Amino acid sequence: MMKKSAFLAVIILMFCNACSIKGSFQGLYSYYYKTKSQDPLLLIVPDTSTSLCEINKPDTPRIIVINGSILKECIKTNNKAVVYLWAPKCKGKFCYSLNLLQQECDTRGVALYIVAEYYDTQLMQINYKINKPISGIDVEYYNSNRTSKYLSRFIYDLTLRKDMSGRLIYFEDGVFKKSFESIEEI
């Protein structure tokens, strides 16, 4: 019995030693600090005297670091607006090309605000054909580096709702109306 237990322990140790996790934990953590160190000029934290609405999309990609309350104030300046919670590495059915999403919103007369769920230096350095700069959630403001924690706080600040289904959040005259998955619902 003792030999069998020792043999089993050796097999388990060998199996665990041979296993490794490939890839990153993007989506679980923000990667804000990694992005900040890789490309310090990519992230812009606006001073409190500058309104998010006044920041134009620069010629080179820049990510505006914001919280939900700041974005909510800017959304109030539009008749219709959609916030897209962008997961840069998302490959699912309801993950959209930023360029396509901008075209759809332009066709429907809806302002588009893109907010990255987490930071990805490589995909954030692309110069997308969008009207407004991409925003990133301020993890220091929300005092968390875990995506689920700061994202739920951001959404609450934006909509005053605790739970949300869908990556697209729709507003009329600054008031939250609904959230949805499909761009056809815009």
Features from the language model and the residues they span:
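Positively charged n-region of N-terminal signal peptides that target proteins for export
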Residues: M1-S5
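C-terminal motif of bacterial Sec signal peptides marking the signal peptidase cleavage site
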Residues: F15-A18
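N-terminal "domain-start" segment that seeds a small globular fold
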Residues: G23-C74
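Short active-site neighborhood of thiol/selenol oxidoreductases, capturing the structured segment around
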Residues: K72-L100
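Structural microenvironment flanking redox-active thiols in thiol-disulfide oxidoreductases
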Residues: V83, F94-P133
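Short, internal strand/loop/helix patches
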Residues: N127-S165
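A short, hydrophobic beta-strand/beta-hairpin element that forms part of a small beta-sheet core
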Residues: M164-S179
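A short acidic/small-residue loop/turn micro-motif
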Residues: S182-I186
